[in-house]
């Protein structure tokens, strides 16, 4: 898969993940938010919860189990801490989520996957 194809597939996965979150009552407040620490694919809000979401797409469901690692989550968490100051309101909570996508499968939303490292 070329870098351009991977980029296109990633953007499509992010659109699907955003749609999935909206169906679950979340409001998308940011997409592909870059910081010096890294990038967050989606930022979503539901009530007082801000979720910083990493989206992963793989060619098969079996590949999803190894799609995310601690190093990647640490970068998302570091970027989330930077973005938090601009996006959070008084009383908000935050968490790091992952949405896993594979052909023929419903999106798998893993909530609150990061607890520091």
How would you name each of these model-derived features?
Residues 33, 56, 113-114:
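Residues forming the ATP-binding cleft of Hanks-type serine/threonine protein kinase domains
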Residues 23-50:
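Active-site metal-binding core of divalent-cation-utilizing nuclease and nuclease-like domains
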């Amino acid at each position: 898969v070329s870098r351009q194809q991977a980029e296109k597939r990633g953007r499509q996965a992010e659109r699907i993940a955003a749609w999935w979150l909206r169906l679950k009552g979340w409001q998308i407040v940011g997409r592909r938010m870059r910081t010096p620490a890294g990038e967050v694919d989606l930022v979503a809000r539901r009530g007082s919860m801000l979720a910083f979401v990493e989206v992963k797409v793989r060619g098969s469901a079996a590949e999803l189990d190894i799609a995310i690692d601690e190093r990647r989550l640490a970068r998302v968490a570091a970027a989330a801490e930077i973005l938090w100051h601009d996006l959070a309101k008084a009383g908000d909570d935050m968490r790091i989520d992952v949405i896993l996508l594979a052909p023929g499968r419903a999106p798998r939303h893993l909530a609150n996957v990061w607890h520091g490292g």
